[in-house]
Amino acid sequence: MSKKHHHKHDHFEIIHKDCGYGVHAKVSVVKRESDGKLLIWKQPVSSNPEHQKAFREEIKRSKYWRKFGISHVKVCWYSDKHSLLKTYIKGKTLTQILKDDSQFFSKTKSRSLKALGKFLRLLIDSRHYIQNLSCKNLVFDGKKWHVIDSSNVHDRESRSRTRREYKRKFFETWSKRLHSNNEIHYLKSFLEKYCR
């Protein structure tokens, strides 16, 4: 990595500056000086108060993710009280996995697919529906899947409603990344097995 990508900022070194952009934030990967741990630094894209509101909501959502065991990501205010620091999860997103392996859902014995099934059951059993849980917001660290970002979280009265919503949403979202009817068939089988 060339030195032009390294910048000092208070107690961490910026490794990848502005490597991602969203509605509310630009994202950098940073290394904490005290222990060398990688973190995500989210800075607001402007001074609009809506960005701070979105950051407060993200902190709340991360507590929910940890409470139900669907992520180890912690989110907190940085010392400037305007930007966030988040746990960096090393691994591949579901988007990257599906791009690299179009046969992913047919490999029923793979560790990552079994872990994804277990992850789905945790989501359903929580009786909460996480909006906008896209492929790019799910990361596999080699052992388990983590939510790294999402929209709102909604309480659901019944497990069956939660199951139906996830099953429909995941099929709708994930099937767009598949290239054959055969793979779509395997996705349906996977969702039938784990979204019960």
For each feature predicted by the language model, list its residue ranges.
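Protein kinase catalytic-loop region centered on the HRD/HxD motif
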Residues: F119-H128
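Hydrophobic residue at the +6 position relative to the catalytic HRD Asp in the kinase catalytic loop
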Residues: L133-F140
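Juxta-kinase regulatory segment immediately upstream of eukaryotic protein kinase catalytic domains
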Residues: M1-K17
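C-lobe/activation-segment region of protein kinase-like
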Residues: H128-Y129, D141-R196
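Conserved structural core of kinase catalytic domains
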Residues: H72-S112
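ATP-binding glycine-rich loop module of kinase domains
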Residues: E13-E58
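A conserved alpha-helical element in kinase catalytic cores
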Residues: K42-C76, R111, Y166
